[in-house]
Each structure stands twice: as structure tokens, then as C-alpha cells.
């Protein structure tokens, strides 16, 4: 039985990375440094732009985060692909929250737009995931749109984020 809370702490997210939150067969979040959120502040089975589920999570920004030291030297900026990966992470986390089992894999995205950046001077990144569809057959898959905001300003949008849960990834 999945503990379906509306919010999760950093320790909860780390427990997910160790395979402890959604059980031995549930999907896992990545461990640091690839875990791209500090907390989930809201999860619902309704709501969002399509009233089919919503997730909101946050990442605290500080100049010591690992990517600022290498991307780019003298011009530090969070790689846009990390924000995209965070959205995929949250789609997979939601599938586990719904009780889905398997190993999460990003399956694609229809369109991504970057209209801003995350600099070391920022305070907080907010991720918003609006679910469009959940497929619960042999393959469990989530389809969602996502947004990334920095200090309240929209900087990335993604349409048709897809994540699947697989029982066997050997042929993937």
C-alpha cells in the first residue's frame, strides 16, 4: 500500500532513491546529484490544467550546486536538460504515488521551450506538472505538460512529457 501524502520532504525523496518509499517494485527517484528537487509541495489526483492530476515540487538554489562549477566556467547556469529531467522525474514519481510498479524510463517529450535561465543568484526553482493521461495496462505510462519557474517567473515549458514504468528493461 502506497502512502499517498500530498507532500514529501527531502528525506522522503531520498528514501525513494533507495527504493524505500514505494516498495521494492515501485519506481525510484535518482540519488543526488541527479535528484533535481528538494521537496514535493503538492500532489493530487485531480487538478492541474486538465483536471487529471497535478504535482508541484521545488529545488532550492545556491551557488554551490554541482552544475554551476562546470556549466560554464565564468558563466554559471543550470543546464536546461536538468530542468527537463526533473519534470520526467516527477512524472515517474507520480506514477509510483498512484501505485504503479516498475522501473521508470523517460520516453520522450513533444516540445520543450526555454525562455529563461537558472543562475546561481536565484533562490528557488518550482516545477509544475499537469497530467493529461495515465495509461495503466501492460505498460504504465504518464503523459503530462510541465512548467519550470525560477523565483516565480516561467522559464521552461514542456508538452507531452512521457514516462513509462517497465517490469523488464533489458530490451529497452
Swiss-Prot record:
<comment type="function">
    <text>Necessary for the introduction of cis unsaturation into fatty acids. Catalyzes the dehydration of (3R)-3-hydroxydecanoyl-ACP to E-(2)-decenoyl-ACP and then its isomerization to Z-(3)-decenoyl-ACP. Can catalyze the dehydratase reaction for beta-hydroxyacyl-ACPs with saturated chain lengths up to 16:0, being most active on intermediate chain length.</text>
</comment>
<dbReference type="InterPro" id="IPR029069">
    <property type="entry name" value="HotDog_dom_sf"/>
</dbReference>
<protein>
    <recommendedName>
        <fullName>3-hydroxydecanoyl-[acyl-carrier-protein] dehydratase</fullName>
        <ecNumber>4.2.1.59</ecNumber>
        <ecNumber>5.3.3.14</ecNumber>
    </recommendedName>
</protein>
<dbReference type="GO" id="GO:0006636">
    <property type="term" value="P:unsaturated fatty acid biosynthetic process"/>
</dbReference>
<keyword id="KW-0443">Lipid metabolism</keyword>
<keyword id="KW-0275">Fatty acid biosynthesis</keyword>
<dbReference type="InterPro" id="IPR010083">
    <property type="entry name" value="FabA"/>
</dbReference>
<feature type="active site">
    <location>
        <position position="71"/>
    </location>
</feature>
<dbReference type="GO" id="GO:0034017">
    <property type="term" value="F:trans-2-decenoyl-acyl-carrier-protein isomerase activity"/>
</dbReference>
<keyword id="KW-0444">Lipid biosynthesis</keyword>
<dbReference type="Pfam" id="PF07977">
    <property type="entry name" value="FabA"/>
</dbReference>
<dbReference type="GO" id="GO:0019171">
    <property type="term" value="F:(3R)-hydroxyacyl-[acyl-carrier-protein] dehydratase activity"/>
</dbReference>
<dbReference type="GO" id="GO:0005737">
    <property type="term" value="C:cytoplasm"/>
</dbReference>
<comment type="subunit">
    <text>Homodimer.</text>
</comment>
<comment type="pathway">
    <text>Lipid metabolism; fatty acid biosynthesis.</text>
</comment>
<keyword id="KW-0276">Fatty acid metabolism</keyword>
<keyword id="KW-0456">Lyase</keyword>
<keyword id="KW-0963">Cytoplasm</keyword>
<dbReference type="InterPro" id="IPR013114">
    <property type="entry name" value="FabA_FabZ"/>
</dbReference>
<keyword id="KW-0413">Isomerase</keyword>
<comment type="similarity">
    <text>Belongs to the thioester dehydratase family. FabA subfamily.</text>
</comment>
